Design a protein with these regions (language model features):
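Active-site-proximal mixed secondary-structure blocks
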Residues: 1-37, 42-167
Length: 167
């Protein structure tokens, strides 16, 4: 069971780095690991669970990995200290390089949940995927479609339960 005070502090830490880069999602499908920057997310309570919604575009390498995963971690990094690593993850595709190796960031594994995270992160949300919904032209307003999806590179909305927080 999550401690609500800890959840409040962790969410507050997260919003201190947004909308500037500083939030990395680490996915692992058992054969591949990948880091991707996250700019759009929501925290809340759904199905009597503390949850986070993340949005991943279909064109992203992490899309395939997340669709074959049960868990992921959200890692809050201090942008001032890790700007080069964050920029690498934002500007490079995991199809073309091993972003974890190239960034020099260290992978940590929770011995109980086996969820991997970034050791250097100031806050980590360990998450279990509950639901995936594809956004498309039929479920978006015309305004949103024109502004964010004119090339039809839609997001998948992934709802995940927050299992654990490390700070």
């Amino acid at each position: 069971m999550l401690d609500l005070q800890e959840l409040h502090l962790a969410v507050n830490d997260t919003f201190k780095v947004l909308p500037t880069p500083g939030l990395l999602l680490l996915s692992n499908d058992g054969t591949q690991k990948n880091l991707i920057t996250i700019g759009w997310l929501q925290f809340g309570n759904l199905w009597n669970k503390w949850t986070v919604n993340v949005f991943i575009r279909l064109s992203r390498h992490s899309f395939k990995i997340l669709n074959n995963s049960e868990y992921f971690s959200l890692n809050v990094l201090a942008p001032q200290k890790y700007i080069n690593q964050i920029n690498l993850c934002a500007q490079t595709s995991g199809r073309n390089c091993d972003k974890i190796k190239e960034s020099g960031l260290t992978i940590a594994e929770n011995s109980e949940t086996k969820i991997i995270s970034i050791a250097e992160a100031q806050t980590v949300f360990e998450c279990k995927i509950l639901n995936k919904v594809m956004l498309d032209k039929t479920n978006l307003s015309d305004d949103l479609h024109k502004k964010f999806y004119s090339n039809d590179d839609f997001h998948q909305l992934i709802t995940a339960e927050i299992l654990n927080i490390k700070r």
